[in-house]
Structure formats: C-alpha cells, structure tokens
C-alpha cells in the first residue's frame, strides 16, 4: 500500500486528507516513481481552494517530486527502473509516496543533486528559467523588479540574476526576508511594509524605473507594478498569491505608457521533452556548480501526512524559500 493526499471538496488546508491506496502499474508511456521528496508550491493552494479547479473531485494534489523509478511502461526507452528522476509537470497527485507520470515529463537527476534539492528547486527553477531567459531575456547590468524576492521562486531568481550579471530589485515584507534576498544576490531590496514601492524604485533607478516587472503577488500589487514600468515596459504577471487580478481595464496600459502585459505559464514554455532537457540542463548546471544554492530549512520539511500544516504555514507567509513533504 502507498499513501497520498486527497481532497474531496474545495476549501482551506483542512480539506486535505491522507488516504491509503494500491498504485496501478504505469501505462505504456509512463513511469512509476517512488517519491523521496515532494515540492510544495503556492499553485497547490490555488488548486485546493478552487481558484484553479482540478478536472474532477476527489483529486490528488501536487505536480513536483524527486525519487527513484520503480516501474517503466512498455513504450518507455529513455528511462529505466532504478534511475533517479525529478519532475514538475505531472498530473495532480505528486503528494504521494508513489506516483505514475508521463515519462517525457521527467528529467534524469545528476548524482551531484540530492532528492531534496531537486524537489525544492525544479518547478521554481524552471519557472525562473522561462521568466528570465524566455518571457523577457534579462541582460547583464539590466535593472528589473521582482516581487516576493525571498520566496521559493524569488530566492532562485536572485541567484540566477546575479549569475547573469543583472541587477534584481526585490520586494520583501520583513527585514529578515530582506537579508535573505540580499544574501542570495538581490542588488537592492524594497520593504513594501515600510517604504513606498514606486517612490523607492524611482530613487534606486535615478527616476528611470524599469523595463520589466515580474509579479507573482497579483491583486495587491497590480497597479503599483504598472507604475514601476518605463514607457512601453513589460508587466509579467505569473501568480496570484494575494488574489487574482480581475476587472482589468485595458485602457490603463495606454494611460501608463503603452505598456505590455503577459500572463505566462510553465506549460506555455516547456512542453516537449527537448524543451525540458534544455531547461533542466541549464538549471542543473547552476545547482551542481554551486551558483544556485538550494537549502530547505528543517522546519519547512514536513511528513507527507502533515500536508494540512504545511499549507497553513505557507499561506501565512511565514516561510522563506522552499518547503517539502517527505514520504
């Protein structure tokens, strides 16, 4: 028997429950993975709450984990039983001790990277990859704004930006998070609880503002993010941690300087096995060389059955960096 987390209705963390099940054999194009570490991501809370409803209920949760391949479907040739793998784009159900996934959605994990490092960084790292390398290609010395710089995605973005020679200006909510972002490689930080975001950004940039803003916060920062952009600047809205942006008047983009807005997703940038290989190789190289460091605080590692508590703490904004479930 194996254990997985399910929910039968939408709601808060209390709807999550651990159930025992017998895993099915993998289909022809699938592999079965014994998960060793499972990534917890903010999008998981959107799915649980119903903001991004799953295809049906009851539903599993989670799309990211790292582990060992235990079984291989008859049509899979590039992965074998015993391989170490990581994945971030599975069907819902990664919050599980065993999970069947499409083989082309898994990447072979280099020996230099642990299961915990992989599960803590793969979805977030691939997200930073497409944001900084594809959605808008950040150049050396370029100044740009990145919200939630001390979160799981943010800390990887700080390190990746530094590796690119770029100048990430990060927003944070506490002095402790400011220190974390700066240590990771942020060029400047703005504490939005103590400083006026737009005015402080103007000070930092000598009044020029920035060409691109990366915003995973959503509703609370939408208009202020637009006000941080130069004429014809790009707003990259890639999350809704404060709630979804609704009722948008497109005329505001005209009024604030002929701005552009995009709402990208990982699936829009990494769909094929070739795209996954290109992205994961770049990410793994940065992690294995120590350019990107992935450390998960011990208090942010939870037994699989404690998924409720993990979600409560994540949504309280009390975490720094990544959190994991351990089967």
Curated annotation (Swiss-Prot):
Protein name listed in UniProt: Quinone oxidoreductase 1
EC number annotated for this UniProt entry: 1.6.5.5
Residues bound to NADP(+): 42-46, 130, 152-153, 173-177, 192, 216, 238-241, 264-266, 317
Subunit structure: Homodimer.
InterPro entries the record matches: ADH-like_C (IPR013149), ADH-like_N (IPR013154), GroES-like_sf (IPR011032), NAD(P)-bd_dom_sf (IPR036291), PKS_ER (IPR020843), QOR-like (IPR047618), Quin_OxRdtase/zeta-crystal_CS (IPR002364)
Key words of the record: NADP, Oxidoreductase
Pfam families: ADH_N, ADH_zinc_N
Root EC class: oxidoreductase
Any Gene Ontology CC annotation: cytosol
SUPFAM superfamilies: GroES-like, NAD(P)-binding Rossmann-fold domains
Family according to the record: Belongs to the zinc-containing alcohol dehydrogenase family. Quinone oxidoreductase subfamily.
Reactions catalysed, as given in the entry: 2 a quinone + NADPH + H(+) = 2 a 1,4-benzosemiquinone + NADP(+)
The keyword Oxidoreductase appears for this protein: yes
Keyword Cytoplasm: no
GO MF: mRNA 3'-UTR AU-rich region binding; NADPH binding; NADPH:quinone reductase activity; protein homodimerization activity; zinc ion binding
Top-level taxon of the source organism: Bacteria
């Amino acid at each position: 028997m194996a254990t997985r987390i399910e929910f039968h209705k939408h709601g808060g963390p209390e709807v999550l429950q651990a159930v025992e099940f017998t895993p099915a054999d993998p289909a022809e194009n699938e592999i079965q993975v014994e998960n060793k570490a499972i990534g917890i991501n903010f999008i998981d809370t959107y799915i649980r709450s119903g903001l991004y409803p799953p295809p049906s209920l009851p539903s599993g949760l989670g799309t990211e984990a790292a582990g060992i391949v235990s079984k291989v479907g008859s049509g899979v040739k590039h992965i074998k039983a015993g391989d170490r793998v990581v994945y971030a784009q599975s069907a819902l159900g990664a919050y599980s001790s065993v999970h069947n996934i499409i083989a082309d959605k898994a990447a072979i994990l280099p020996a230099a990277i642990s299961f915990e490092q992989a599960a803590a960084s793969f979805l977030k790292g691939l997200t930073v990859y497409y944001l900084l390398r594809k959605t808008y290609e950040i150049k050396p010395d370029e100044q740009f704004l990145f919200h939630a710089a001390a979160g799981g995605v943010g800390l990887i973005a700080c390190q990746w930006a530094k590796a690119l020679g770029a100048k990430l200006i990060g927003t944070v909510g506490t002095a402790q998070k400011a220190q974390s972002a700066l240590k990771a490689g942020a060029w400047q930080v703005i504490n939005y609880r103590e400083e006026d975001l737009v005015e402080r950004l103007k000070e930092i940039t000598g009044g020029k503002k920035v060409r691109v803003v990366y915003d995973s916060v959503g509703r609370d920062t939408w208009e202020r993010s637009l006000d941080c952009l130069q004429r014809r600047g790009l707003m990259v809205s890639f999350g809704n941690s404060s709630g979804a942006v609704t009722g948008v008047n497109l005329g505001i983009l005209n009024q604030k300087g002929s701005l552009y807005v995009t709402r990208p997703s990982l699936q829009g940038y990494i769909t094929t096995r070739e795209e996954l290989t290109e992205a994961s190789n770049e990410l793994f190289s940065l992690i294995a060389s120590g350019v990107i460091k992935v450390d998960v605080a011990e208090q942010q590692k939870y037994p699989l059955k404690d998924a409720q508590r993990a979600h409560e703490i994540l949504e309280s904004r009390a975490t720094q960096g990544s959190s994991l479930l351990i089967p």
